[in-house]
């Protein structure tokens, strides 16, 4: 009986082994690529991503924003036309430029730079216009266009109190060789260099430096626009402004020659701001 049971168990094991080895093998890689097709009517559930696993997001194509700015070049050391209050440039030119930009539907951006770099910046197109108490001259008209005048200016002479220079005529007197300080690139620089010769004219980056040279004895007088001259004399004891002016002039905005559309638009804006009293109000705010 025991022998019969042993033979029976052996036969069952052989049958089981044969059944296992005859089952078709499924390739694991193939299984991984199989996509289950849902049975019709069966609810399809979206797979929730595992925490930490990146979920693919469709990238949005950025829309390029329209540039709605207009860029002004100035030299912000020309009070009260342009100067700093904290880190902001303010003054007559800054406010008038803001009003013009508003008329054009633009946001104003002001770039501060050396005065003698303004024309180049306008010519090369790195800025849209230059506004810095700038006078129209034949020399400047060769490289840029100018708008209508929006303000008038006077070139004044600053001297030390008790100076031998008491009138403008003293600078032209026979044998006179007074040293004149000017801001580089300004009409004061242009006129003085023409009148007295480059050897007698010392050029400085701004009016403050020119006045420091006057106080230090490096120059005998400083020629600069009247309004900045008033501010400089007020800030420095022992200085005075001659009663007679050196030159009278008008201020305008410089624009690249090829930008005639902007020139026409700014002239129209200036005319409107003069007509409605805006420019007079701005000037009166700074010049009492």
Residues covered by each model-derived region:
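Extracytoplasmic small-molecule ligand-binding "clamshell" domains
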Residues: 29, 64-133
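Flexible hinge/capping segments at coil-to-helix
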Residues: 147, 159-179
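Ligand-binding clefts/hinges and TM-proximal coupling segments of bilobed small-molecule sensing domains
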Residues: 60-62, 67, 187-204, 237-245, ...
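Short helix-initiation/N-cap motifs at beta->coil->alpha
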Residues: 94, 109-122, 166, 184, ...
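Bacterial lipoprotein signal-peptidase II cleavage site
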Residues: 17-28
């Amino acid at each position: 009986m025991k022998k019969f049971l042993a033979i029976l168990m052996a036969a069952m094991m052989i049958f089981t082994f044969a059944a296992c080895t005859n089952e078709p093998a499924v390739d694991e890689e193939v299984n991984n690529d199989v996509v289950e097709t849902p049975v019709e009517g069966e609810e399809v559930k979206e797979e929730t991503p595992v925490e930490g696993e990146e979920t693919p997001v469709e990238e949005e194509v950025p829309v390029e924003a329209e540039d709605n700015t207009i860029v002004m070049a100035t030299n912000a050391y020309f009070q009260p036309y342009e100067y700093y209050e904290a880190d902001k440039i303010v003054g007559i030119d800054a406010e008038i430029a803001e009003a013009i930009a508003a008329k054009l539907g633009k946001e104003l951006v002001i770039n501060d730079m050396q005065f003698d770099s303004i024309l180049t910046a306008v010519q090369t197109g790195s800025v849209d216009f230059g506004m810095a108490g700038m006078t129209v001259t034949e020399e400047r008209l060769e490289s840029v266009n100018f708008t209508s005048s929006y303000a008038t200016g006077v070139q004044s002479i600053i001297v030390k109190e008790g100076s031998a220079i008491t009138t403008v005529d003293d600078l032209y007197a026979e044998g006179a060789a007074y040293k004149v300080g000017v801001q580089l690139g300004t009409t004061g620089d242009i006129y003085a260099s023409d009148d007295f010769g480059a050897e007698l004219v010392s050029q400085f980056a701004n009016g403050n430096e020119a006045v420091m040279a006057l106080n230090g004895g490096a120059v005998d007088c400083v020629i600069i626009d009247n309004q900045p001259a008033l501010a400089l004399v007020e800030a420095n004891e022992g200085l005075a402004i001659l009663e007679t002016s050196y030159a009278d002039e008008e201020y305008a905005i410089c624009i690249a020659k090829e930008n005639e559309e902007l020139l026409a638009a700014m002239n129209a804006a200036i005319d409107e701001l003069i007509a409605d009293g805006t420019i007079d109000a701005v000037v009166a705010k700074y010049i009492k």
